Amino acid sequence: MAGDDASSARRILPDGCIDLVWREGRLLIAGPDTSAWTSSVPAGGTVVGLRMRPGIGGSVLGLPASELRDARAESVDVWGRVGSELAERVGEESDLEGRRALLASALTKRLADAERTDSLVLAASRRLGFPGSRVAELSDALGISDRQLRRRFHDAVGYGPKTLDRILRLQRFVARAPSVISQDEDLARIAADLGYADQAHLTRDCRRLTGMTPTALAVAWADRIEPSLRERPPNGRPITVSPDRIASRT
């Protein structure tokens, strides 16, 4: 992502992911968001980053993902000297692809060196990425208690399964934004398709997570959705580093 001649502001929606981002000479780790926020890129500035899919953040970070919920931290503050050295190397690269390759290599190594990745949470996160999934059924399906499931989600994702379910459902709505704008489908039908109890439920979640009504959100996002991502579940984003795990974000 590059800034225009004037400062470029972009609204960031919660998506269940943790990002490693290089911007303005700083290497930042953006924790999992629970509400939308605005990111600005100065004129002529660039942002390069990688997105970690829901469920692997805790392993890559080396600490509970919940500690970075709704927060941005310098890599040195999370990874110490390793984070500082990575920031220096990325800063020495002169092109975007070189920086992206360094970030991808670093995340792949941290994932390989991690003691373990919580495969149960990964499986649960994938299930929540599709319409028709029910949080209430996850514990029984995975053979653990509700309390254990919540704890493991907080460690690996950054918040509980209900919050992730709400966020992924919002992402599915965003993918339907073109249909909302063209009025090919009404909001009540879309809400039902995506697993909302009714249109009012969709409206409440949109306001809670973004501060916008469903229609306003659709208008704001319709022209920002890549055609290849429309109608696809959030966990179906293009993968750059390793299957199912780390996806590119620019």
Description of each model-found segment:
Residues 153, 165, 205-207, 218:
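DNA major-groove recognition helix of helix-turn-helix
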